[in-house]
Every structure is written in structure tokens, then in C-alpha cells.
From Swiss-Prot:
It is found in: Cell membrane. A lipid is attached at C17 (N-palmitoyl cysteine). It is a lipid-anchor. Keywords: Cell membrane, Lipoprotein, Membrane, Palmitate, Signal. InterPro entries: YbfN-like. This is Uncharacterized lipoprotein ChiQ. GO terms for cellular component: plasma membrane. Induction: In the absence of chitobiose, expression of chiPQ is silenced by the MicM small regulatory RNA (sRNA), which sequesters the ribosome binding site of the chiPQ mRNA by an antisense mechanism. In the presence of chitosugars, the chbBCARFG chitobiose operon is induced and acts as an RNA trap to degrade the constitutively expressed MicM, leading to the translation of chiPQ. It comes from the Bacteria. A lipid is attached at C17 (S-diacylglycerol cysteine). Its main location: membrane. It comes from Escherichia coli (strain K12).
Length: 108
């Protein structure tokens, strides 16, 4: 009987531990994305790597809205960079800088 109670207490303790690590992992993912953006310095290759973290965040219900909004911003920025390579460099660069600043300000 004592063993059964001890096992039940240990099992409930493990469940509590397992539940408390999930929010920590979620916040770590968001922190990882922010760190990725802050170190990307506008590099298209690095931003593409950040996109993979966003894809994981999209799967988490509590971060889905944030991830969707950031995905749009990142795609806008990537399209902006492509436009600078193919055409009106100076006019588009100002727009790119604006989009990049939005991304950075959301990840401080």
C-alpha cells in the first residue's frame, strides 16, 4: 500500500515537471527566433534560417498569431531584397530598410 502511494506521488510529480517544461520550451523558441533575427543583420541566408524557427512556432497555438505576422514581414523583406537585385535599387532599399526595422522592433 505504501509503495502504491509512493508511486502515485512520484508519478504526479513527473506529470507536473513535464507540464512545466512545455511553456519554457515555447518561450525558448520565441527567444531563439528573436536572437536569430537580431544576429541576421539583414542577410537573406540568415533570415531564411530564422524562417524555420517560425515554422515551428506556427504549430504552437499560443504563438501562431505572432508567427503568422512575422512570416508575412519576413516574406515581404525577402521580396524586397529580390527587388533590389533586379531593379530600382535606391527606391526599393528604403522600403526594405523600413520592413527590416519592423521585424527588428518586434523582436527586441
Amino acid at each position: 500500500m505504501k509503495k502504491l502511494i509512493l508511486i502515485a506521488i512520484m508519478a504526479s510529480g513527473l506529470v507536473a515537471c513535464a507540464q512545466s517544461t512545455a511553456p519554457q520550451e515555447d518561450s525558448r523558441l520565441k527567444e531563439a527566433y528573436s536572437a536569430c533575427i537580431n544576429t541576421a543583420q539583414g542577410s537573406p541566408e540568415k533570415i531564411e534560417a530564422c524562417q524555420s524557427v517560425l515554422n515551428v512556432l506556427k504549430k504552437e497555438k499560443q504563438h501562431q498569431q505572432f508567427a503568422d505576422q512575422e512570416s508575412v514581414r519576413v516574406l515581404d523583406y525577402q521580396q524586397c531584397l529580390r527587388a533590389t537585385q533586379t531593379g530600382n535599387d535606391q527606391a526599393v532599399k528604403a522600403d526594405c530598410d523600413k520592413v527590416w526595422q519592423e521585424i527588428r522592433s518586434n523582436n527586441k
